[in-house]
Amino acid sequence: MIMTEVPEGLNYTKTHEWYRKDGNTATIGITDYAQSQMTDIVYVDLPKVGDKKKAGDVLLTIESVKSAEDVYSPITGTVTAVNEEVAKHPESINKDPYGSWLVKMAIESEGEHLSASEYRKLIQ
């Protein structure tokens, strides 16, 4: 079994997104487990700054050599920043899924989320 990294201090979703709260801002990415299942990531279709999303809405799409996967918004809010570096170098998600954030959003409300220990149980 491959061990995947699940850092403490982040919130996780059942659809394999992570987010870190900093005041009223959420920084969002995909988990180590998600990137390992997708294999080599080749393209990220980021949303636009100003896009409004509800928790559970499709936030963006990531394409790998294996498949195209939707990434779902873990919160309800407005996109305030996108990581253009990830768009230019999508493989960075494979190398560092927790350092390669995808978007930042202003939080209106949070959706359902899991702690690190709950997420570890989900992916075992």
Curated annotation (Swiss-Prot):
Residues 25-106 form the Lipoyl-binding domain. Pfam families: GCV_H. Keywords: Lipoyl. Its cofactor is (R)-lipoate. The modification N6-lipoyllysine is found at K66. The glycine cleavage system is composed of four proteins: P, T, L and H. This is Probable glycine cleavage system H protein. It comes from Thermoplasma acidophilum (strain ATCC 25905 / DSM 1728 / JCM 9062 / NBRC 15155 / AMRC-C165).
